[in-house]
């Protein structure tokens, strides 16, 4: 029973922080999701490297992941040019690709796969939440708050998890 109560209060605290950061401002939203992106990529790469075959530079991947999230956030909020924001990320990917091909690792293909998988499977969905929150859609009025779609998404995910 004690374990259940600890889990319950932890879940309530996490939900409260997530809803509050989403509701307050675009900056708190970005801060929370930037932190979630970094932690998720770190955990994902830790799981992949557990068997010993994959050896990816986690700090480098975390920096690249945070940049991708930040580029989507800036693109959604400030409507800066996609070229200006995403060319540095493409150069980062090219650097990682070349670095891995010329490294002395025994499995460079596994490492490249882990890098690409971490960016597409973990970072891209978290980064695209910015497009949901700050995108300009014709079906919504201009007075609709930015947090309406992400909070609705949270509710649907929580209801789905609870019902499963």
Give the label of every model feature segment:
Residues 1-164:
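Membrane-embedded alpha-helical bundles of polytopic integral membrane proteins
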């Amino acid at each position: 029973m004690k374990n259940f109560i600890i889990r319950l209060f932890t879940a309530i605290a996490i939900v409260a922080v997530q809803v509050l950061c989403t509701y307050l401002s675009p900056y708190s939203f970005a801060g929370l999701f930037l932190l979630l992106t970094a932690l998720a990529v770190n955990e994902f790469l830790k799981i992949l490297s557990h068997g010993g075959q994959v050896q990816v530079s986690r700090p480098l991947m975390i920096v690249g992941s945070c940049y991708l999230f930040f580029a989507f956030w800036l693109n959604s909020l400030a409507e800066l040019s996609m070229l200006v924001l995403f060319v540095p990320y493409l150069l980062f990917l090219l650097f990682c690709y070349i670095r891995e091909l010329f490294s002395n690792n025994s499995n460079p293909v596994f490492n490249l796969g882990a890098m690409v998988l971490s960016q597409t499977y973990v970072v891209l969905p978290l980064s695209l939440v910015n497009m949901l929150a700050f995108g300009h859609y014709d079906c919504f009025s201009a007075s609709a708050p930015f947090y309406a779609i992400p909070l609705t998404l949270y509710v649907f995910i929580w209801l789905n998890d609870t019902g499963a």
